[in-house]
């Protein structure tokens, strides 16, 4: 795992709760992510990883993202 200050969603270990710090995707993609619940300060749980994808639980819903998009979501471990 990378250091907390530089961690992206794809780096989060399975089962870990993380807090979204900021998004670095294009504005229209960031807007859609926020609509899905991936907004700044939201707490997300990494449920499963595989085949270059990640499944997260956000707002009591499981959402699948590809690794490229998950690398655009910067997080820190939630306390």
Give residue spans per PLM region:
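Amphipathic, hydrophobic secondary-structure cores in small proteins
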Residues: 14-70
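Extended boundary segments
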Residues: 1-11, 74-79
């Amino acid at each position: 795992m990378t250091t907390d200050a530089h961690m992206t969603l794809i780096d989060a270990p399975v089962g870990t709760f993380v807090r979204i710090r900021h998004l670095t995707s294009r504005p229209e993609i960031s807007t859609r992510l926020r609509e899905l619940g991936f907004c700044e300060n939201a707490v997300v749980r990494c449920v499963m990883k595989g085949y270059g994808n990640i499944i997260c639980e956000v707002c009591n819903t499981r959402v699948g993202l590809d690794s490229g998009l998950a690398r655009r979501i910067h997080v820190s471990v939630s306390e």
